[in-house]
Amino acid sequence: MAVITVRWVVQAFADAPEIALIYGEPWEDMRQRSSAAINPAIPDETGFRIPKTDARLRYMHPQYGFDTPLARFFTISFKDERVSSIRMSPQIEPLLLDDAMKIVQDLQDQWRRRGWELTSPKTDPAIADTPEWRTRLRDINKGGTTFWQADDTYQIMLILHRFKDDRHPDEERYLISLSIGNIWVPREKD
């Protein structure tokens, strides 16, 4: 089973179109580095663009970098021809809880290893693969939200919640949402 999982992960990342960026960089630098096509920014405007195909995010920061799986919902905003925010759902379709939890745990593990810290560990702790978290996530009215930040520069909001998927009406499906931008939630005080 482990060999199959490793092979799947390697294949999933090997040839996947990607958007490779650093928050705040010039839009054209991101476009030239990325293998997924995305339209140019509009000079002197604020707006967003969507990759022309499913793509994964490769966050290229030398200290805080990380990679996501392929995403169907993926928007990159610009202001003054610079990357100004990222919003995405790092999945192609709503997932079963086990599959969604694997992605969330992988992302959080990457962030920990690269120096990201929880913004509010008491009120918005990391999402854990525990019976308590699974019970909470199964409640359609709850879900889980956690915030991570890189020094005092960038912040990530990660949300995992149950999602009604009409294609799979008899299954519990889950949606992961990820936003990256300037810090908008202050650090929790001790």
Predicted regions mapped to residue ranges:
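Generic detector of well-ordered alpha-helical segments enriched in charged/polar residues
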Residues: 10, 20, 105-108, 157
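Long, charged/polar, surface-exposed segments that mediate recognition or autoinhibition
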Residues: 70-143, 184, 190
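Long, continuous compositionally biased terminal/linker segments
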Residues: 41-44, 49-79, 131-190
